């Protein structure tokens, strides 16, 4: 019984300050949940993807700035209308679905439309992943801007197979991001495998490296959380999903007798790697290595390893760092002609490293019912942290083909 304002034993006492803090914490949690589920920047992604398509695809095609490898792919699409089979009669190191797209579009405006749709899808799933993992929509928007600028420059005139594969790569990552954010929910891994299979038939080697990176992310996270059984289930579910897509499409190469040629052509860039006998090694190391440093890859790699992060972000950094380093090594050891667009293969890994570099906001009390989270700009940190050298790299990659052709 309460007499003269005194509380009986067992009845909790909540001073005004504690009640006020509890209300604020509840409001902050509600605001964070609402932030994660609303405000998809549809119009921004639509415009950015259109801009990137025009810069990376339309402008090089109109002015004859397409890379030799990409021009060969366009020629293959035209030649398939005349006669012959891909892989048997014409060389191709990309996937079967990619050459089907080239065949259907014949290098016309339809291919640019397909690239636009692919870039829109990539931006959609990238934003979804960033929002799921961090809940910081402002920095996720800045990540989209950096991503599209990098695609426009690194994909200028070539590596379109990687670009059209990115929505499937980022869709697979978005499903894994859902699991990393909420380990209780590990559904959707069948779709992870199916999405990676579709990406494989567009751009095989980058997809295999990205799949390896995702596997390392899950392995590291499951070890940290002691979820070994879940890891086995995820592996077999992903493998089943991959098989559902791989075998029906791959069966076409068996029927046409091009299976062996398809494997050899796909692995040709890897089979011809050289160290001591590679006359282009020094040029490759200087060109790709310098661009990698100027783009800030060293900073991203070091920060991904050194800075303390939650388990989910640290797991992402392990896979992304390994995928990035292996991709750079393949470029340096390659005997293929130098071209800036070949660096587009690093984009999926570089984007993930940028994603985990988000800074946590510092909450400040604005009123009894609101809190505003102020976070530093991802765009400014990326540029200032690398002394604005990424701007130099972007301008260089955009104007180098122009100077090489017309001057």
Language model: regions and residue ranges:
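Aromatic- and kink-enriched transmembrane "portal" helix at the membrane-lumen/periplasm boundary
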Residues: 99, 108, 145-167, 201, ...
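Transmembrane-helix motifs of polytopic, lipid-linked glycan transferases
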Residues: 112-135, 171, 175, 302-304
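Membrane-interface transmembrane helices that cradle and orient dolichyl/undecaprenyl
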Residues: 134, 169-191, 225, 299-313, ...
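Membrane-interface alpha helices of multi-pass inner-membrane proteins
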Residues: 188-204, 210, 215, 325-333
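Hydrophobic/aromatic-rich transmembrane helices and adjacent perimembrane loops
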Residues: 335-379, 387-393, 403-406
């Amino acid at each position: 019984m309460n007499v003269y304002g005194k509380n009986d034993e067992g009845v909790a006492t909540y001073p005004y300050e504690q009640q006020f803090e509890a209300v604020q914490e509840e409001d902050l949690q509600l605001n964070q949940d609402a932030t994660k589920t609303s405000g998809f920047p549809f119009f921004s992604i639509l415009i950015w993807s259109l801009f990137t398509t025009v810069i990376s695809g339309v402008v090089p095609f109109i002015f004859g700035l397409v890379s030799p490898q990409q021009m060969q792919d366009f020629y293959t699409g035209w030649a398939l209308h005349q006669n012959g089979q891909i892989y048997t009669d014409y060389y191709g190191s990309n996937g079967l679905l990619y050459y089907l797209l080239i065949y259907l579009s014949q290098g016309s405006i339809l291919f640019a439309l397909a690239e636009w749709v692919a870039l829109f899808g990539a931006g959609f799933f990238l934003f979804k992943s960033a929002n799921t993992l961090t809940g910081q929509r402002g920095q996720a928007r800045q990540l989209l801007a950096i991503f599209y600028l990098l695609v426009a420059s690194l994909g200028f005139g070539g590596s379109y197979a990687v670009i059209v594969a990115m929505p499937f790569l980022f869709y697979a990552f978005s499903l894994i991001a859902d699991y990393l954010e909420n380990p209780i929910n590990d559904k959707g891994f069948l779709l992870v495998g199916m999405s990676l299979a579709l990406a494989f038939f567009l751009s095989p080697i980058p997809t295999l490296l990205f799949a390896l990176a995702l596997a390392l992310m899950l392995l590291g996270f499951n070890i940290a959380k002691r979820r070994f059984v879940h890891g086995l289930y995820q592996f077999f579910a992903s493998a089943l999903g991959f098989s559902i897509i791989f075998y029906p499409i791959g069966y076409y190469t068996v029927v046409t007798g091009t299976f062996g040629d398809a494997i050899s052509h796909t692995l040709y860039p890897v089979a011809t790697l050289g160290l001591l006998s590679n006359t282009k090694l020094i040029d490759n190391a200087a060109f790709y290595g310098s661009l990698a440093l100027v783009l800030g890859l060293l900073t991203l790699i070091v920060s991904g390893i050194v800075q303390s992060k939650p388990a989910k972000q640290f797991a992402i950094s392990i896979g992304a760092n390994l995928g990035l380093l292996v991709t750079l090594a393949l470029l340096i050891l390659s005997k293929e002609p130098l071209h800036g667009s070949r660096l587009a293969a690093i984009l999926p890994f570089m984007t993930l490293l940028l994603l985990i570099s988000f800074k946590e906001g510092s909450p400040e009390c604005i009123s009894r019912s609101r809190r505003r989270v102020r976070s530093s700009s991802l765009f400014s940190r990326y540029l200032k942290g690398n002394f604005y050298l990424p701007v130099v790299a972007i301008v260089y990659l955009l104007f180098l083909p122009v100077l090489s052709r017309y001057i």
